[in-house]
Structures are given as C-alpha cells and as structure tokens.
C-alpha cells in the first residue's frame, strides 16, 4: 500500500486465509453467502470470508493492518472507484475500466486491483448471443457501464450509451426512437432502477418497440425478474438477470487470489 506497504502474513502459525467484501450497508451481501457455501461444498476448511462494512474508504487501511491473514478482497458499491488511490498496482483491464471490484494482497502487503465484473458479464452473455445481436444499448453511464462496455468491445459488439441527459457520448431516454430500439437488439441495464425494495422502478425506454429478436440483460439479480425484464418478456424478448454474472465474477476473483502471479 502507498505510504508504507503493509505486511499481511507475518506468522507461519496463522494458517487461516481470510478474504473480505469491502462495501457499505452490505449485510445482504451475495459474496459472503456465496463463498461460505463454496467453502462448505468444496470442503475448503482453511479459508474464511468476512464483510468489511465501512462508512468511508479511509477506514480500509486500518482494517487491512488489523487482519494479518487477509489475502484478497472484493469491492462493491460505493467504493469501486474510491479504492483506486489505495492500490499499488492496477491490471491492464482496470486501467481501462477505472472501477475495481477485486484486490489481491501480495506477500509484502502490496495491493493489486482488478476488475472481474467484465469477465462475469461477458461470459454470462455469450451463451445467449445470436448473430443478429450485433448492436447494443447500455442503459446508464456509471462504473458498471464501463465494465459492460469493455466486455462488448472484446466481443466486437458496438454499443450506444443511454443516460438521463444527452451528452457527447450518450443519448437521452427521450431520444430512443423506434428505429433506435429496433436497430439495437441487445439492451443492457446497468442502472439500479428496479433493485429491491424499489421493484416497481424501471428504465424509461419505449418497451412497445421491443421484439422477440431482442435480448434484455439486467445486471440486477434481486429481484430475479425486474420490471425491466418483465416488460421485455411481455414483448417476446429473451431475458437474463445478473446472477450468473455475479457467480462468474466471484470465481474469476477466486482464481486471481489463488494464482502465483
């Protein structure tokens, strides 16, 4: 860590390997539940996964110092961008995406940041793609949209950003004409609209022009079927929520933590 690296494994007697989720108000956490189940199912007895539920990112260095068995962290809202200044190294993908959701702690305490959200999105999307899914609308321009855009670039799918207000890089929702909707057969919601408990909310797109040629992907996983997906389903579209993305990004993080690099 900058301004003095932190040694996190200072005793060979400490055999437990600790991993953590960094976030705020994360008692609902998918990650902690997922890794607890993974460790139980795979009989991994020397690992634990805990929550660092913190009010500000400035608290994190002290928590790392206080947890000498800590080897890796996941990072969730609202700290994916705020954590960047604490990193000693960034992966090539993270430099491009600028939103960190995975950190590996080196043997001398250095923090290297990664983004595995794009891996989770890309690898969960590919099985559903058909040749006509060749142009995409990305709803939202926050950190999650950057990971989605990076993945679509890898897949060779051009995309158009959509935001509440028009800009040099984004259309506004008011500019989504029938022609725009029908010429973009992949629509990805990266906004929080529709997340539990506000399940009645949805992005204000003209759903009446969605057809069975469309694939609607919502990064939200709770509820399982958001209003965005339900409205697309009524029009005959294929729908996909964010649960598989979460699983795949978690497994990508696990692979990073256990790699020799």
List PLM regions with ranges.
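NAD(P)-binding Rossmann-fold cofactor-contacting core
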Residues: 155-171
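Phosphate/diphosphate ligand-binding glycine-rich loop within oxidoreductases
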Residues: 16-128
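Conserved S-adenosyl-L-methionine
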Residues: 154-158, 235-238
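Short, basic, low-complexity termini and linkers enriched in Ser/Thr/Gly/Pro
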Residues: 1-15
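Active-site capping/gating segments
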Residues: 123-124, 238-261
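Short glycine-rich anion-binding loops that position phosphate/pyrophosphate groups of nucleotides
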Residues: 75-82, 144, 192-195, 222
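Rossmann-like adenosine-cofactor binding region
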Residues: 169-240
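Glycine-rich adenosine-cofactor-binding loop
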Residues: 23, 115-118, 125, 129, ...
């Amino acid at each position: 860590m900058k301004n003095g690296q932190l040694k996190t494994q200072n005793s060979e007697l400490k055999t437990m390997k600790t991993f953590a989720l960094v976030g705020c108000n994360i008692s609902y956490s998918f990650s902690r539940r997922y890794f607890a189940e993974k460790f139980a199912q795979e009989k991994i007895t020397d690992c634990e996964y805990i929550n660092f539920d913190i009010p500000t990112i400035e608290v994190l260095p002290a928590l790392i110092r206080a947890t000498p068995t800590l080897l890796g962290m996941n990072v969730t809202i609202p700290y994916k961008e705020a954590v960047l200044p604490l990193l000693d190294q960034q992966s090539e993908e993270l430099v491009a995406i600028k939103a960190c959701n995975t950190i590996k702690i080196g043997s001398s305490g250095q923090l290297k940041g990664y983004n595995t959200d794009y891996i989770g999105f890309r690898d969960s999307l590919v099985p559903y793609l058909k040749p006509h899914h060749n142009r995409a609308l990305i709803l939202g321009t926050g950190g999650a949209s950057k990971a989605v855009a990076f993945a679509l670039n890898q897949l060779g799918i051009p995309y158009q950003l959509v935001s509440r207000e028009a800009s040099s890089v984004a259309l506004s929702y008011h500019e989504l004409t029938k022609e725009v909707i029908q010429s973009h057969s992949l629509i990805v919601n990266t906004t929080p609209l529709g997340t539990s408990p506000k399940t009645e909310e949805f992005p204000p797109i003209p759903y009446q022009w969605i057809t069975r040629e469309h694939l609607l992907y919502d990064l939200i996983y709770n509820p399982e079927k958001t209003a965005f997906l339900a409205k697309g389903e009524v029009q005959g579209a294929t729908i996909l929520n964010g649960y598989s993305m979460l699983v795949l990004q978690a497994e990508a993080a696990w692979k990073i933590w256990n790699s020799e690099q």
